[in-house]
Protein backbone atom coordinates (compact mmCIF):
# COMPACT_ATOMS: atom_id res chain seq x y z
CA UNK A 1 0.00 0.00 0.00
CA UNK A 2 2.81 2.40 0.79
CA UNK A 3 4.50 1.69 -2.53
CA UNK A 4 1.37 2.32 -4.45
CA UNK A 5 0.72 5.54 -2.58
CA UNK A 6 4.26 6.69 -3.26
CA UNK A 7 3.84 5.88 -6.91
CA UNK A 8 0.62 7.91 -6.99
CA UNK A 9 2.35 10.89 -5.41
CA UNK A 10 5.39 10.73 -7.67
CA UNK A 11 3.57 10.18 -10.93
CA UNK A 12 2.06 13.69 -11.18
CA UNK A 13 5.42 15.25 -10.49
CA UNK A 14 7.11 13.11 -13.10
CA UNK A 15 4.40 13.91 -15.58
CA UNK A 16 4.88 17.65 -15.00
CA UNK A 17 8.60 17.36 -15.56
CA UNK A 18 8.15 15.37 -18.73
CA UNK A 19 5.61 17.77 -20.22
CA UNK A 20 7.09 21.08 -19.10
CA UNK A 21 8.81 21.59 -22.55
CA UNK A 22 5.44 22.21 -24.15
CA UNK A 23 4.99 25.52 -22.32
CA UNK A 24 8.52 26.86 -22.65
CA UNK A 25 9.32 26.02 -26.32
CA UNK A 26 6.76 28.01 -28.38
CA UNK A 27 8.10 31.52 -27.65
CA UNK A 28 11.61 31.02 -29.13
CA UNK A 29 10.17 29.25 -32.20
CA UNK A 30 7.87 32.18 -32.92
CA UNK A 31 10.69 34.71 -32.65
CA UNK A 32 12.97 32.59 -34.85
CA UNK A 33 10.34 32.25 -37.58
CA UNK A 34 9.55 35.98 -37.57
CA UNK A 35 13.22 36.79 -38.16
CA UNK A 36 13.17 34.64 -41.30
CA UNK A 37 9.96 36.15 -42.55
CA UNK A 38 7.70 33.12 -42.06
CA UNK A 39 4.08 33.93 -41.18
CA UNK A 40 3.33 33.76 -37.47
CA UNK A 41 -0.07 32.09 -37.87
CA UNK A 42 1.40 29.19 -39.79
CA UNK A 43 3.89 28.59 -36.97
CA UNK A 44 1.21 28.75 -34.30
CA UNK A 45 -0.63 25.88 -35.94
CA UNK A 46 2.40 23.68 -35.42
CA UNK A 47 2.58 24.42 -31.65
CA UNK A 48 -0.04 21.93 -30.50
CA UNK A 49 2.00 18.99 -31.77
CA UNK A 50 1.92 15.64 -30.08
CA UNK A 51 3.65 15.80 -26.65
CA UNK A 52 6.13 13.02 -27.36
CA UNK A 53 9.46 14.11 -25.84
CA UNK A 54 11.51 12.32 -28.49
CA UNK A 55 9.90 14.30 -31.35
CA UNK A 56 10.42 17.67 -29.72
CA UNK A 57 14.05 18.03 -30.83
CA UNK A 58 13.45 17.06 -34.47
CA UNK A 59 10.57 19.52 -34.59
CA UNK A 60 13.03 22.41 -34.21
CA UNK A 61 15.42 20.97 -36.78
CA UNK A 62 12.81 20.36 -39.46
CA UNK A 63 11.22 23.80 -39.16
CA UNK A 64 14.09 25.79 -40.78
CA UNK A 65 14.33 23.49 -43.85
CA UNK A 66 10.62 24.06 -44.54
CA UNK A 67 11.04 27.82 -44.27
CA UNK A 68 14.12 27.88 -46.53
CA UNK A 69 12.45 26.30 -49.58
CA UNK A 70 9.56 28.70 -49.14
CA UNK A 71 11.95 31.65 -49.51
CA UNK A 72 13.70 30.48 -52.72
CA UNK A 73 10.82 30.28 -55.17
CA UNK A 74 9.08 33.42 -53.97
CA UNK A 75 11.71 36.08 -54.79
CA UNK A 76 13.45 34.27 -57.67
CA UNK A 77 10.60 33.41 -60.06
CA UNK A 78 8.73 36.77 -60.09
CA UNK A 79 12.04 38.67 -60.47
CA UNK A 80 13.01 36.62 -63.51
CA UNK A 81 9.60 37.14 -65.04
CA UNK A 82 10.01 40.95 -64.96
CA UNK A 83 13.48 41.14 -66.51
CA UNK A 84 12.71 39.80 -70.00
CA UNK A 85 10.13 42.53 -70.60
CA UNK A 86 10.08 43.62 -74.31
CA UNK A 87 11.45 47.10 -73.65
CA UNK A 88 14.97 46.60 -74.99
CA UNK A 89 13.94 44.99 -78.29
CA UNK A 90 11.60 47.93 -78.96
CA UNK A 91 14.35 50.48 -78.34
CA UNK A 92 16.71 48.55 -80.60
CA UNK A 93 14.28 48.88 -83.52
CA UNK A 94 13.68 52.61 -83.00
CA UNK A 95 16.79 54.16 -84.67
CA UNK A 96 16.54 52.66 -88.21
CA UNK A 97 13.40 54.56 -89.32
CA UNK A 98 15.16 57.89 -88.62
CA UNK A 99 18.49 57.99 -90.45
CA UNK A 100 20.94 60.62 -89.21
CA UNK A 101 21.51 62.53 -92.44
CA UNK A 102 18.70 61.83 -94.88
CA UNK A 103 17.78 64.81 -97.07
CA UNK A 104 15.48 62.94 -99.43
CA UNK A 105 12.20 64.15 -100.96
CA UNK A 106 9.24 65.32 -98.94
CA UNK A 107 5.67 66.26 -99.80
CA UNK A 108 5.07 68.87 -101.07
CA UNK A 109 8.78 69.86 -100.83
CA UNK A 110 11.70 70.15 -98.41
CA UNK A 111 11.97 73.91 -98.80
CA UNK A 112 10.86 76.77 -101.02
CA UNK A 113 11.56 80.48 -101.49
CA UNK A 114 10.68 83.36 -103.80
CA UNK A 115 12.63 86.63 -103.94
CA UNK A 116 12.65 89.90 -105.82
CA UNK A 117 15.83 89.51 -107.88
CA UNK A 118 16.45 93.27 -107.96
CA UNK A 119 16.01 94.13 -104.28
CA UNK A 120 16.56 90.73 -102.63
CA UNK A 121 13.23 91.08 -100.82
CA UNK A 122 11.83 87.70 -99.76
CA UNK A 123 8.34 87.30 -101.18
CA UNK A 124 7.72 83.77 -99.92
CA UNK A 125 9.64 81.39 -97.68
CA UNK A 126 8.85 77.96 -96.31
CA UNK A 127 11.63 75.88 -94.69
CA UNK A 128 14.08 77.83 -96.81
CA UNK A 129 17.03 76.65 -94.65
CA UNK A 130 16.10 72.96 -94.72
CA UNK A 131 18.85 70.95 -96.46
CA UNK A 132 18.09 68.84 -99.51
CA UNK A 133 19.74 67.18 -102.48
CA UNK A 134 19.51 69.61 -105.44
CA UNK A 135 20.26 66.93 -108.09
CA UNK A 136 20.78 68.56 -111.51
CA UNK A 137 20.18 72.05 -110.13
CA UNK A 138 23.82 71.55 -109.09
CA UNK A 139 24.73 72.12 -112.75
CA UNK A 140 23.89 75.81 -112.33
CA UNK A 141 27.11 76.30 -110.36
CA UNK A 142 29.07 74.51 -113.10
CA UNK A 143 27.30 76.75 -115.61
CA UNK A 144 28.25 79.89 -113.65
CA UNK A 145 31.93 78.98 -113.29
CA UNK A 146 32.32 78.20 -116.99
CA UNK A 147 30.65 81.50 -117.96
CA UNK A 148 32.97 83.34 -115.57
CA UNK A 149 35.98 81.62 -117.15
CA UNK A 150 34.80 82.69 -120.61
CA UNK A 151 34.31 86.25 -119.39
CA UNK A 152 37.82 86.20 -117.92
CA UNK A 153 39.24 85.06 -121.26
CA UNK A 154 40.49 81.72 -119.95
CA UNK A 155 38.88 79.98 -122.93
CA UNK A 156 36.23 80.75 -125.53
CA UNK A 157 32.77 79.44 -126.32
CA UNK A 158 33.98 77.98 -129.61
CA UNK A 159 36.87 76.09 -127.97
CA UNK A 160 36.48 72.34 -127.87
CA UNK A 161 36.53 70.21 -124.73
CA UNK A 162 37.53 66.55 -124.96
CA UNK A 163 35.58 63.86 -123.11
CA UNK A 164 37.61 61.61 -120.82
CA UNK A 165 36.73 57.98 -120.01
CA UNK A 166 35.35 59.27 -116.70
CA UNK A 167 33.08 61.77 -118.46
CA UNK A 168 31.93 59.17 -120.99
CA UNK A 169 30.99 56.79 -118.16
CA UNK A 170 28.42 59.17 -116.65
CA UNK A 171 24.91 57.76 -116.54
CA UNK A 172 22.01 59.52 -118.31
CA UNK A 173 20.88 62.06 -119.01
CA UNK A 174 23.70 62.39 -121.52
CA UNK A 175 24.60 63.45 -125.04
CA UNK A 176 26.39 60.17 -125.71
CA UNK A 177 29.99 61.35 -125.53
CA UNK A 178 32.68 58.70 -125.97
CA UNK A 179 36.27 58.90 -124.73
CA UNK A 180 38.29 61.19 -127.00
CA UNK A 181 35.27 62.86 -128.60
CA UNK A 182 34.88 66.62 -128.26
CA UNK A 183 32.21 69.32 -128.38
CA UNK A 184 32.38 73.10 -128.26
CA UNK A 185 31.97 74.87 -124.93
CA UNK A 186 28.84 76.52 -126.34
CA UNK A 187 27.22 73.20 -127.24
CA UNK A 188 28.24 71.66 -123.92
CA UNK A 189 26.59 74.55 -122.06
CA UNK A 190 23.40 74.03 -124.06
CA UNK A 191 23.64 70.32 -123.30
CA UNK A 192 23.69 70.83 -119.53
CA UNK A 193 21.03 73.58 -119.48
CA UNK A 194 18.55 72.03 -121.91
CA UNK A 195 19.21 68.30 -121.81
CA UNK A 196 20.80 68.24 -118.32
CA UNK A 197 23.55 66.03 -119.73
CA UNK A 198 25.80 64.59 -117.03
CA UNK A 199 28.64 63.69 -119.41
CA UNK A 200 28.67 67.27 -120.70
CA UNK A 201 28.89 68.67 -117.15
CA UNK A 202 31.83 66.38 -116.32
CA UNK A 203 33.60 67.34 -119.56
CA UNK A 204 33.18 71.05 -118.81
CA UNK A 205 34.44 70.57 -115.24
CA UNK A 206 37.60 68.78 -116.37
CA UNK A 207 38.24 71.30 -119.15
CA UNK A 208 37.86 74.25 -116.77
CA UNK A 209 40.15 72.70 -114.15
CA UNK A 210 42.76 71.94 -116.82
CA UNK A 211 42.65 75.55 -118.03
CA UNK A 212 43.29 76.83 -114.50
CA UNK A 213 46.23 74.44 -114.09
CA UNK A 214 47.76 75.65 -117.33
CA UNK A 215 47.39 79.25 -116.27
CA UNK A 216 49.36 78.45 -113.11
CA UNK A 217 52.02 76.61 -115.10
CA UNK A 218 51.28 73.16 -113.63
CA UNK A 219 51.99 70.13 -115.84
CA UNK A 220 48.51 68.93 -116.95
CA UNK A 221 49.69 65.57 -118.26
CA UNK A 222 50.26 64.28 -114.72
CA UNK A 223 46.68 64.95 -113.57
CA UNK A 224 43.95 62.32 -113.85
CA UNK A 225 40.34 63.13 -114.84
CA UNK A 226 39.26 62.34 -111.27
CA UNK A 227 41.79 64.84 -109.91
CA UNK A 228 40.62 67.48 -112.37
CA UNK A 229 37.02 66.91 -111.31
CA UNK A 230 37.99 67.15 -107.63
CA UNK A 231 39.79 70.44 -108.28
CA UNK A 232 36.71 71.84 -110.03
CA UNK A 233 34.41 70.73 -107.20
CA UNK A 234 36.69 72.47 -104.70
CA UNK A 235 36.32 75.62 -106.76
CA UNK A 236 32.53 75.19 -106.75
CA UNK A 237 32.56 75.13 -102.96
CA UNK A 238 34.81 78.20 -102.73
CA UNK A 239 32.48 80.12 -105.02
CA UNK A 240 29.48 79.01 -102.99
CA UNK A 241 31.06 80.43 -99.83
CA UNK A 242 31.79 83.70 -101.64
CA UNK A 243 28.10 83.95 -102.56
CA UNK A 244 27.02 83.36 -98.95
CA UNK A 245 25.71 79.84 -99.60
CA UNK A 246 26.58 78.80 -96.07
CA UNK A 247 24.68 75.50 -95.99
CA UNK A 248 25.82 74.22 -99.39
CA UNK A 249 28.33 71.45 -100.00
CA UNK A 250 29.05 70.43 -103.57
CA UNK A 251 30.40 66.95 -104.28
CA UNK A 252 30.04 66.73 -108.08
CA UNK A 253 29.70 69.00 -111.13
CA UNK A 254 26.44 67.37 -112.23
CA UNK A 255 24.38 66.46 -109.13
CA UNK A 256 24.44 62.71 -109.61
CA UNK A 257 24.25 60.63 -106.41
CA UNK A 258 27.54 59.02 -105.34
CA UNK A 259 28.30 55.63 -106.87
CA UNK A 260 28.09 52.57 -104.65
CA UNK A 261 31.11 52.30 -102.43
CA UNK A 262 32.09 55.92 -103.05
CA UNK A 263 33.00 58.18 -100.13
CA UNK A 264 32.26 61.48 -101.84
CA UNK A 265 28.71 61.96 -100.56
CA UNK A 266 25.77 63.89 -102.01
CA UNK A 267 25.53 67.47 -103.17
CA UNK A 268 23.62 69.32 -100.43
CA UNK A 269 22.03 72.77 -100.46
CA UNK A 270 18.99 74.75 -99.31
CA UNK A 271 16.38 76.81 -101.10
CA UNK A 272 17.81 79.98 -99.52
CA UNK A 273 21.32 79.16 -100.74
CA UNK A 274 20.26 78.26 -104.27
CA UNK A 275 18.40 81.52 -104.69
CA UNK A 276 21.69 83.35 -104.01
CA UNK A 277 23.19 81.48 -106.96
CA UNK A 278 20.17 82.45 -109.04
CA UNK A 279 20.64 86.15 -108.25
CA UNK A 280 24.12 86.05 -109.78
CA UNK A 281 23.09 84.03 -112.82
CA UNK A 282 20.23 86.31 -113.91
CA UNK A 283 22.75 89.18 -114.05
CA UNK A 284 25.25 87.21 -116.15
CA UNK A 285 25.40 88.23 -119.82
CA UNK A 286 24.06 85.47 -122.09
CA UNK A 287 23.09 83.22 -119.15
CA UNK A 288 19.34 83.47 -119.77
CA UNK A 289 19.83 82.81 -123.48
CA UNK A 290 20.88 79.28 -122.46
CA UNK A 291 18.33 78.70 -119.69
CA UNK A 292 15.35 79.93 -121.73
CA UNK A 293 15.80 77.43 -124.59
CA UNK A 294 12.88 74.99 -124.78
CA UNK A 295 14.84 72.97 -127.34
CA UNK A 296 17.93 73.32 -129.52
CA UNK A 297 20.22 71.50 -131.93
CA UNK A 298 23.90 70.92 -131.18
CA UNK A 299 26.73 69.06 -132.87
CA UNK A 300 27.51 65.94 -130.88
CA UNK A 301 30.86 64.27 -130.29
CA UNK A 302 30.63 62.36 -133.56
CA UNK A 303 30.05 65.55 -135.56
CA UNK A 304 26.35 64.87 -136.12
CA UNK A 305 23.42 67.18 -135.34
CA UNK A 306 21.65 66.32 -132.11
CA UNK A 307 18.30 67.80 -131.07
CA UNK A 308 17.86 68.46 -127.37
CA UNK A 309 14.49 68.97 -125.66
CA UNK A 310 14.30 70.66 -122.28
CA UNK A 311 12.54 69.59 -119.08
CA UNK A 312 11.44 73.04 -117.85
CA UNK A 313 7.83 73.17 -118.96
CA UNK A 314 7.20 76.62 -117.49
CA UNK A 315 9.20 78.05 -120.41
CA UNK A 316 7.03 79.13 -123.38
CA UNK A 317 6.93 76.88 -126.45
CA UNK A 318 7.83 73.85 -124.36
CA UNK A 319 4.46 72.16 -123.70
CA UNK A 320 4.35 69.59 -120.94
CA UNK A 321 3.48 66.17 -122.40
CA UNK A 322 1.93 65.20 -119.06
CA UNK A 323 0.17 68.58 -118.70
CA UNK A 324 1.28 69.00 -115.11
CA UNK A 325 1.98 72.71 -115.55
CA UNK A 326 1.11 75.61 -117.83
CA UNK A 327 3.89 77.62 -119.50
CA UNK A 328 4.28 81.24 -118.39
CA UNK A 329 5.14 83.81 -121.08
CA UNK A 330 7.33 85.69 -118.58
CA UNK A 331 9.45 82.64 -117.62
CA UNK A 332 12.98 82.41 -119.05
CA UNK A 333 14.81 79.90 -116.85
CA UNK A 334 16.45 78.31 -115.10
CA UNK A 335 16.88 74.58 -114.30
CA UNK A 336 15.12 71.42 -113.16
CA UNK A 337 16.59 68.51 -111.22
CA UNK A 338 15.60 64.96 -110.36
CA UNK A 339 17.03 61.74 -108.95
CA UNK A 340 15.30 59.03 -106.96
CA UNK A 341 17.30 59.99 -103.88
CA UNK A 342 16.73 63.74 -104.18
CA UNK A 343 13.21 63.98 -105.52
CA UNK A 344 12.23 66.82 -107.84
CA UNK A 345 13.67 70.34 -107.61
CA UNK A 346 13.50 73.46 -109.75
CA UNK A 347 14.81 77.01 -109.97
CA UNK A 348 12.63 79.39 -111.97
CA UNK A 349 12.93 83.02 -112.96
CA UNK A 350 10.40 85.29 -114.63
CA UNK A 351 10.01 89.01 -115.29
CA UNK A 352 7.06 91.38 -115.46
CA UNK A 353 7.02 95.13 -116.04
CA UNK A 354 10.77 95.38 -115.68
CA UNK A 355 10.82 93.44 -112.39
CA UNK A 356 12.24 89.94 -111.95
CA UNK A 357 11.57 87.17 -109.44
CA UNK A 358 13.43 83.95 -108.65
CA UNK A 359 11.72 80.86 -107.22
CA UNK A 360 13.33 77.72 -105.81
CA UNK A 361 11.45 74.55 -104.86
CA UNK A 362 13.75 71.91 -103.36
CA UNK A 363 13.12 68.21 -102.80
CA UNK A 364 9.51 67.64 -103.86
CA UNK A 365 8.14 64.12 -103.63
CA UNK A 366 7.25 64.09 -107.33
CA UNK A 367 6.82 66.15 -110.49
CA UNK A 368 3.18 66.85 -109.75
CA UNK A 369 4.00 68.32 -106.33
CA UNK A 370 6.93 70.32 -107.72
CA UNK A 371 5.07 71.85 -110.66
CA UNK A 372 2.01 72.66 -108.57
CA UNK A 373 3.99 74.35 -105.80
CA UNK A 374 6.39 76.17 -108.14
CA UNK A 375 3.56 77.42 -110.35
CA UNK A 376 1.57 78.84 -107.42
CA UNK A 377 4.62 80.47 -105.84
CA UNK A 378 5.85 81.97 -109.12
CA UNK A 379 2.46 83.44 -110.07
CA UNK A 380 1.92 84.88 -106.60
CA UNK A 381 5.42 86.38 -106.61
CA UNK A 382 4.83 88.05 -109.98
CA UNK A 383 1.53 89.45 -108.71
CA UNK A 384 3.25 90.74 -105.57
CA UNK A 385 5.97 92.70 -107.37
CA UNK A 386 3.40 94.13 -109.79
CA UNK A 387 1.64 96.07 -107.02
CA UNK A 388 4.76 97.37 -105.26
Model-derived regions: residue spans:
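Penicillin-recognizing serine hydrolase domain
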Residues: 27-40, 45, 98-100, 105-109, ...
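Beta-lactamase-like hydrolase cores
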Residues: 28-37, 43-50, 55, 60-61, ...
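Short, well-structured active-site flanking segments
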Residues: 148-166, 287-293
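Surface-exposed aromatic
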Residues: 130, 169-174, 253-261
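Signal peptide-directed extracytoplasmic domains
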Residues: 168-194
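Residue-level preference for non-acidic, small/hydrophobic
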Residues: 120, 137-146, 161, 192, ...
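Glycine/charged-rich beta-loop-alpha catalytic/anionic-binding loops adjacent to active sites
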Residues: 121-129, 183-185, 328-331
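Sec-dependent N-terminal signal peptides
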Residues: 2-27
Amino acid sequence: MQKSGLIKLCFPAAWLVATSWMFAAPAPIQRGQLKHGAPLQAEQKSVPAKPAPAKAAPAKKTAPPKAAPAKKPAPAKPALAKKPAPVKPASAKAPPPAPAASYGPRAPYRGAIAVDADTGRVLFADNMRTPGYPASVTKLMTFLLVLEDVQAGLYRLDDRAVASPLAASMEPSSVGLRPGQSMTIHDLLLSIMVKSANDAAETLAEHAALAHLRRRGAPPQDVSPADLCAAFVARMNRRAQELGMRDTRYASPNGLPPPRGSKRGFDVSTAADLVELGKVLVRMPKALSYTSCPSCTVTDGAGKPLTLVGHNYFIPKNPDPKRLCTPLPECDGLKTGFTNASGCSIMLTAHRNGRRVIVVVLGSAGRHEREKAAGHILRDALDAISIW
